Amino acid sequence: TTEIYTLSLHDALPILSAKKENTMKTTTANPVTSEMSRSRTTFMVKLALMVAIIFVMAFSPLGYLRTPGLTITFLTVPVAVGAIILGPTAGAICGGAFGLTSAIMALTGGSAFSAALLQINPFGLLFTLLVPRILEGWLCGLIFAALKKVSKNGAFVIASLSCPLLNTLLFMSSLVLFFFHTEYIQNIASGLGTSNPLFFVVLFVGIQGAIEAVVCTILGSAVSRALTAALKK
């Protein structure tokens, strides 16, 4: 009996030891998994908040300054902030949200200009409203990620400035590509006194693009810098 007990105990020791090691590994791994899950959840909450801000601004007076001759958008500000504090992927999603609000306005008649283009080329309009905005947010995030290694303060300013500039450049490039040859845009170009696509872009954007660039640079850099500091605490 004693011999059987000794053998059984001897055989059981490796099993108990293995179970103990597995338990220790599981216990050690759990905090890492938990931290990753918490980090992912925090990222999603922040991203959802930025997208919500874009939608609230888009469908309220906060998102646009409309005058008889100008429609100035401030939606590049939350796109820039999202791209800077959350990265290029989040920037692309925020840009996509911006484009989606523009598409909704076009489909519901909220923008006379977009509604007119929708009748001419629906695919061209949706491409013009969505793709440039997605690229704008993504590229803004990449610019900040690259420049912060050199000068973080400078990165905030340049990335914030790049967002409205990219928005204007990419949007107008797409607009010219799909619609410059149409009678509707040709009439606008004639009213501006030009038949050259480049001059049309400059004259069409004009003071509107300059105001958007200044506002987004000031607000985007200030807000993103403040949020970055606050999120570290």
Residue ranges and their predicted role:
Residues 1-13:
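Short, small-residue-biased leader/transition segments that mark boundaries at the very start
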Residues 17-233:
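Loop-helix junctions at membrane interfaces
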